[in-house]
């Protein structure tokens, strides 16, 4: 096997290989100390920063979800309250409508009763006025028939008798 590199025109120098191996190890040690350490620290910091951002984002997301849920609850309560207010307003409107109708009916009945009372009163006044006119005419006719003037007491008695007759005939 030692003949193979010579046939190809390659020669190996053990010292060069050893020196290059040693230089490579020193270079790797220096890279590890001066480049890899800070690079790993930067990567660790970046990893920590990203993890912190993810955690922060998750917390903000949880808080946002919590706020959304609170808003849903508040919206649901507001809808229920508005529905309750609408129902109460409808009930109040119906009650006021019924109260107004009832008051209008009562006022109508009161006006009817007042009109009936007024009619009865006017009828009584008309009957009374008619009786007085009839009495006056009766006295006038009677006085012409008798051809004498009745005194006031006799006239009153005659009127009362006539009114009794008229009242009985009704």
UniProtKB/Swiss-Prot annotation:
The chain crosses the membrane at residues 20-42. The keyword Zinc does not apply. GO terms for molecular function: proton-transporting ATP synthase activity, rotational mechanism; proton-transporting ATPase activity, rotational mechanism. It is found in: Cell membrane. The keyword Transcription does not apply. It holds the Pfam family ATP-synt_B. It is a single-pass membrane protein. Gene3D superfamilies: F1F0 ATP synthase subunit B, membrane domain. Its main location: membrane. InterPro entries: ATP_synth_B-like_membr_sf (IPR028987), ATP_synth_b/b'su_bac/chlpt (IPR002146), ATP_synth_F0_bsu_bac (IPR005864), ATP_synthase_B_chain (IPR050059). Keywords: ATP synthesis, Cell membrane, CF(0), Hydrogen ion transport, Ion transport, Membrane, Transmembrane, Transmembrane helix, Transport. GO terms for cellular component: plasma membrane; proton-transporting ATP synthase complex. Belongs to the ATPase B chain family. NCBIfam families: ATP_synt_b. F-type ATPases have 2 components, F(1) - the catalytic core - and F(0) - the membrane proton channel. F(1) has five subunits: alpha(3), beta(3), gamma(1), delta(1), epsilon(1). F(0) has three main subunits: a(1), b(2) and c(10-14). The alpha and beta chains form an alternating ring which encloses part of the gamma chain. F(1) is attached to F(0) by a central stalk formed by the gamma and epsilon chains, while a peripheral stalk is formed by the delta and b chains. F(1)F(0) ATP synthase produces ATP from ADP in the presence of a proton or sodium gradient. F-type ATPases consist of two structural domains, F(1) containing the extramembraneous catalytic core and F(0) containing the membrane proton channel, linked together by a central stalk and a peripheral stalk. During catalysis, ATP synthesis in the catalytic domain of F(1) is coupled via a rotary mechanism of the central stalk subunits to proton translocation. Component of the F(0) channel, it forms part of the peripheral stalk, linking F(1) to F(0). This is ATP synthase subunit b. The gene is atpF.
């Amino acid at each position: 096997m030692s003949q193979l590199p010579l046939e190809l025109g390659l020669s190996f120098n053990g010292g060069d290989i050893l020196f290059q191996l040693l230089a490579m190890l020193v270079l790797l040690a220096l890279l590890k100390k001066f480049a890899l350490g800070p690079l790993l620290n930067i990567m660790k910091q970046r990893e920590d920063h990203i993890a912190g951002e993810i955690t922060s984002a998750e917390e903000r997301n949880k808080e946002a979800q919590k706020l959304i849920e609170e808003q849903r609850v508040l919206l649901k309560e507001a809808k229920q309250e508005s529905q309750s207010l609408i129902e109460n307003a409808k009930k109040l409107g119906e009650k006021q409508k019924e109260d107004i109708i009832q008051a209008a009916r009562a006022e109508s009945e009161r006006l009817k009763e007042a009109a009936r009372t007024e009619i009865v009163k006017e009828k009584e006044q008309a009957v009374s006025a008619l009786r007085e006119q009839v009495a006056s005419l009766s006295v006038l006719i009677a006085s012409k028939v008798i051809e004498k003037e009745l005194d006031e007491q006799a006239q009153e008695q005659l009127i009362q008798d006539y009114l009794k007759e008229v009242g009985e005939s009704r």
